[in-house]
């Protein structure tokens, strides 16, 4: 039986977003919504796996969601107040995890926290909380060059959460990782979703299996086809999958189950048609 959960308030809404450059249609009437999830007496943010073929327009939508680019029409609204997104409201974790190399880990995080907190004491307390929850206290006085790639990723994620409003966009976090590291990143993403009830994560990836492992919802982006099977210009979200409804969330062993493997096969087959 699927775990009982209740969907709470809307945290992010993509509302009829279209994007064109000159005569070229990139995105066409994209709509999607992210809501927080209440389960077992706790609220947690949603983790969305955002999938689509290369060159389909994922990067453009990614930048619009982050408030870095403007759509031709439509809008992206964030927070329970559904405020139009602006640059800085959504944290972006890029593939190379950029940090200030001449500052300690603590200093990197404090710099981020000071952008959001009114007092320096509140900022320090928040940094300490994140270091504790992400098991990085012992590394706090080290410099980025002195820590591992996995630790660097943790710091980059914490940095973006501290200076944004609970939203995190992760660009290809599984790229180039072996199976063990991929599992650790999946574990970390779930930890982040539970750090704060409003933390909301969108993971942009080509990796269907990793996305299905970590996410509670999947978005599949592609183009519509005409009667002859030709792609119609402009991508949109073609499929959304609710993994909570399918009882494939929050079970670490789910990846070995026949049900999960069949679901991944189904998504991969649909992926090939986009």
Each PLM stretch: what is its role?
Residues 66:
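Helix-to-loop junction immediately C-terminal to a conserved catalytic motif
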Residues 74-86:
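Conserved ABC transporter NBD signature motif
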Residues 106-114, 124:
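Short helical segment in ABC ATPase nucleotide-binding domains corresponding to the A-loop/adjacent helical element
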Residues 130-148:
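Conserved ABC nucleotide-binding domain
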Residues 157:
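Hydrophobic anchor residue at the start of the ABC signature
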Residues 162-166:
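A short, proline-enriched helix->beta-strand linker immediately N-terminal to the Walker B motif
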Residues 168-172:
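Catalytic Walker B motif of ABC-type/P-loop ATPase nucleotide-binding domains
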Residues 182-197:
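Helical segment within the ABC ATPase nucleotide-binding domain
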């Amino acid at each position: 039986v699927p775990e009982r959960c209740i969907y709470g308030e809307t945290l992010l809404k993509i509302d009829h977003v279209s994007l064109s450059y000159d005569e070229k249609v990139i995105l066409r009437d994209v709509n999607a919504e992210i809501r927080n999830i209440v389960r077992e007496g706790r609220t947690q943010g949603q983790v969305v796996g955002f999938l689509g073929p290369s060159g389909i327009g994922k990067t453009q939508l990614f930048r619009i969601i982050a408030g870095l680019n403007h759509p031709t029409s439509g809008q992206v609204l964030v927070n329970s107040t559904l405020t139009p997104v602006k640059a800085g409201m959504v944290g972006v974790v890029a593939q190379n995890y950029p940090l200030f190399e001449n500052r300690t880990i603590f200093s990197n995080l404090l710099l981020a926290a000071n952008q959001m907190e009114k007092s320096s004491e509140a900022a320090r307390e928040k940094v300490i909380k994140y270091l504790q929850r992400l098991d990085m206290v012992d590394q706090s006085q080290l410099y980025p060059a002195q820590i591992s790639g996995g630790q660097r990723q943790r710091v980059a994620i914490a940095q973006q959460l501290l200076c944004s409003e609970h939203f995190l966009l992760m660009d290809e976090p599984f790229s180039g990782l072996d199976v063990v590291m991929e599992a650790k990143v999946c574990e970390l993403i779930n930890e982040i979703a539970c750090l704060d009830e409003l933390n909301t994560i969108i993971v942009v990836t080509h990796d269907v299996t990793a996305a299905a492992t970590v996410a509670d919802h999947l978005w599949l982006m592609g183009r519509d086809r005409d009667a002859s099977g030709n792609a119609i210009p402009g991508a949109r979200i073609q499929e959304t999958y609710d993994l909570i409804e399918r009882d494939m969330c929050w079970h670490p062993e789910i990846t070995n189950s026949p049900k999960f493997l069949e679901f991944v096969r189904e998504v991969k087959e649909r992926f090939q048609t986009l």
